[in-house]
């Protein structure tokens, strides 16, 4: 039996924020390594069928124009999008970023891919689509929105809510429009709660009833 699974552990500086992920059994593995610190000699443990191999990966520093957003939010792994999309760990250390001028919120899917606005912009500064991609930037799907994508999204019943000129529900598998709700009134927040959807801007919130 030549099938084997592989697990990766990127060791943290403090010993409490390792990044671990696994790959299912297969004959051949092409293993991406993400979760590395910038400008650091990272320790990575690759494990398969009870055998561990330790490697070291030295990384470059962050780009000179990298903008770091200070945040008071808590959590083990938080995503932001400044002039680069990036993620930080519980110690506010950057552990992942993408090259490219992508737009809007970063949403992590159950398959460990992300949803993010594309790097294709209209003259008024809105992007015309959003991507499903992996953490290395490989694009699997592009969803076109003729009236623009405003960078706000949320998962809803295994589909995705997005803000274009209206609040829309889109099938992530097919890209088809499932439903349109209210007109976008400069909203910058979506939060599904059971069968309702909360949209908001600034400190004002509205409830949208599905159906």
What are these regions (language model features)?
Residues 3-7, 29-30, 34, 41, ...:
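Histidine-/acidic-rich catalytic cores in large beta-rich domains
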Residues 23-27:
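Short proline/glycine- and polar residue-rich coil/turn motifs
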Residues 14-22, 94-96, 140:
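Surface-exposed loop/edge segments in extracytoplasmic proteins
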Residues 8-12:
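Conserved aromatic beta-strand anchor motif in extracellular beta-sandwich/beta-rich domains
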């Amino acid at each position: 039996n030549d099938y084997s699974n592989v697990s990766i552990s990127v060791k943290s500086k403090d010993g409490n924020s390792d990044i671990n992920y696994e790959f299912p059994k297969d004959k051949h593995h092409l293993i991406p390594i993400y979760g590395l610190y910038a400008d650091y000699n990272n320790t990575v443990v690759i494990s398969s069928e009870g055998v561990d191999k330790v490697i070291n990966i030295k990384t470059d520093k962050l780009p000179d124009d990298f903008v770091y957003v200070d945040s008071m939010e808590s959590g083990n792994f938080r995503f932001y999008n400044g002039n680069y999309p990036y993620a930080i760990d519980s110690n506010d250390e950057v552990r992942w970023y993408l090259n490219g001028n992508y737009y809007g919120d970063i949403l992590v899917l159950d398959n460990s891919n992300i949803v993010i606005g594309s790097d294709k912009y209209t003259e008024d500064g809105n992007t015309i689509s959003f991507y499903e991609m992996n953490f290395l930037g490989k694009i699997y799907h592009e969803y076109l929105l003729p009236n623009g994508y405003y960078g706000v999204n949320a998962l809803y019943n295994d589909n995705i809510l997005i803000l274009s000129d209206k609040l829309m529900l889109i099938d992530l598998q097919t890209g088809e429009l499932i439903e349109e709700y209210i007109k976008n009134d400069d909203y910058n927040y979506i939060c599904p709660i059971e069968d309702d959807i909360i949209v908001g801007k600034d400190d004002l919130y509205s409830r949208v009833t599905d159906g």
